[in-house]
Amino acid sequence: KEKDKIKKNLKLSTVEGCFWAIMYGGGETFLSACAVFLQFTPFQISFLSAFPPFVGSCFQLFSASIKNKFKDIKHFVVTMSYLQAMLWIVLVILLFYKPTYKYILIWSCIYWTTGTAIQPAWTAWMGYFVPRRIRARYFGKRNRIIGFISFLATLIAGFILDIYNDNM
């Protein structure tokens, strides 16, 4: 029974990682291209690439105390992941209105803050249900799958942007 539960959790973790890979490969890797499309200056683009991750990293100092306001680690990780995913819908809506730099910078700071807030809790959570004896093998396999999905998502997103760019 316990072995089946562990297998199920490991599978779900790999599926979750695949969705993250799609978000990363099909989204995050194109944020600078989005900034170029919006005709931001080179300095604005560099600041947009560097400042939000820095803000997110600083926010990690507070993520543990925020996590403690949730029922458990699982609810914190799931809630923050959901919020981070929903931010992509906000970005798509913003893009329809040709947003100013300020709005993209604010969006990016919130996006990176939610993502980096998740990391310590996610790592602790994985430690609870990935048995030590299989951790290295499991994460090696999981990372290969996620890397491949991220690669595909990046190529597909680039192809879609090429089609969109040709039709403008």
Task: Annotate each language-model stretch with its function.
Residues P42-F43, V130-R142:
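Loop-to-transmembrane helix entry/capping segments in MFS-fold secondary transporters
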Residues K1-S63, K67, K74-A85, I89-V92, ...:
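Helix-loop boundary and gating motifs at the non-cytosolic
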Residues F62-K67, M126, R135, A157:
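Hydrophobic/aromatic and small-residue hotspots that mark the transmembrane alpha-helices
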Residues V77-P99, L105, F159-I163:
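C-terminal ends and interior cores of transmembrane alpha-helices
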Residues T29-F37, S65-K69, L91-Y97, S150-M168:
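Transmembrane alpha-helix termini and helix-breaking/packing motifs in multi-pass membrane transporters
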Residues A21, G25, W112-P120:
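Small-residue-rich segments within alpha-helical transmembrane domains of MFS-like 12-TM solute carriers
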Residues G115-P131:
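Intracellular juxtamembrane helix-capping segments at the cytosolic ends
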Residues P53-Q60, T116, G140-G158:
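Glycine-rich segments within core transmembrane alpha-helices of 12-TM secondary carriers
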